[in-house]
């Protein structure tokens, strides 16, 4: 790479970083951190464990955001020094090191730039993920479980806290449905591009004749409700059913009727939770999910009105959005962005960052 090219490249990186820093507003983030640190130091912090958890989680996330931005700025500044050293010493090894670091910095800058695209009304929220098996019988149930593991591994690899609210197991293998929370800021904005129908094509391990099977699973991503959303639920409009929690194959995992199913009579929305130890805890978790679904319903109604005014058909999130092909070739492909990976095993193991980044950029383009 010529000296002039390097100079222009570094100027471009620095300019992009300045734009990112302006959008992130690091001074405001530092001020927010100071406020949260003061709240976290209060002796009464853990009097309300749920509020305390939110404060410490948000504090940790903001601190990581600032550290990440500061570290990336430092790497960009160090790059110019590294290239100068390579030029002055005419050292091929130093130049190779500098060019390798340049590639790595570009990638890190792209990832951070994606974060600045999460500017929607609910993008900064934590997320509720609901996965359900659709057409395809036992293969669909197995596929739904693979998707659950994929998202949980993705979160685990990044140190994000998750909480499984409910998992309904299928009789032979896999799951009928599951609901879990990803408890980190911007989880909703990041994961919302995953909403839609996912398709799996493979030789079915459940078919004695070894035939190719196509199965489907639906993914729904909801923002966690906050008090400012004013989602109020009248208890008289709820039907509450309690039952015994069950595990794989229908086996009971609890000797008491601690699982809770809520039916919101005006809308017909049904949610359930069985993973907590007590009926009270399960009902509270189920209420959180119900509130999120009601918020999403309200949001969709408002969007439909806006689309009608604009003459726009709106986003068809319910349509098929990604295919996972294991036979006759191996490929995972997003049907909206055309982003694809030839290693399905890695994808199912949580390596979905490329799909998320491509989806977020695609969504931003659709909004223009």
Swiss-Prot record:
Pfam families, per database record: PCRF (PF03462), RF-1 (PF00472)
SMART domains: PCRF (SM00937)
Keywords linked to the UniProt accession: Cytoplasm, Methylation, Protein biosynthesis
PTM note: Methylated by PrmC. Methylation increases the termination efficiency of RF2.
Main location group: cytoplasm
One annotated GO molecular function: translation release factor activity, codon specific
Post-translational modification N5-methylglutamine, affected residues: 251
SUPFAM superfamilies in the record: Release factor
Source superkingdom: Bacteria
Cellular component GO terms held in the UniProt record: cytoplasm
InterPro entries: PCRF, Pep_chain_release_fac_I, Pep_chain_release_fac_I_sf, PrfB
Subcellular location field: Cytoplasm
Function comment: Peptide chain release factor 2 directs the termination of translation in response to the peptide chain termination codons UGA and UAA.
Similarity field: Belongs to the prokaryotic/mitochondrial release factor family.
Protein name, entry field: Peptide chain release factor 2
Annotated organism of origin: Streptomyces avermitilis (strain ATCC 31267 / DSM 46492 / JCM 5070 / NBRC 14893 / NCIMB 12804 / NRRL 8165 / MA-4680)
